[in-house]
């Protein structure tokens, strides 16, 4: 499991919860202690040489895991989008020995155990799903997060009218173009608010922040 630099700093509870869910569904989770940055931020900045070095180091770290490796999982879509592009970035010189998957596509594909479903507490209320650009456009993942959310008893999912519109984070766009990013954020917030949702679910730490 990749922890993600920004996620580790700003909301480590995401990784903690991810590990708990995976273990509760029968999966062994390995977190290499020497894992570094995936290179997403430097990639956004166009620093390709630094990105390639970070990517090479991360591949080495993940491939050093002992025993069978079914997947390299990511719980931040910005990281996952970059890691899935390593083949092109590294020109085939280094590659993970297992596929890179967002944790949601992994769980949706493998299925949730009935013992896990039985432990899920009801969440009465309306939830809107925010589709991160790096997930819906970059990785083609849209149905899986909704499938998992619907496993929660009593949850009501409502769709925003502009689900595919950027929230303004866009990698580092909110840092280099703060005014334009803030306007995109306002549009996104208005759209999500119009659903009447009490909660907004997001699968990317950049969007959440």
Predicted features by range, described:
Residues 2-209:
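Iron-sulfur cluster-binding electron-transfer modules in prokaryotic oxidoreductases
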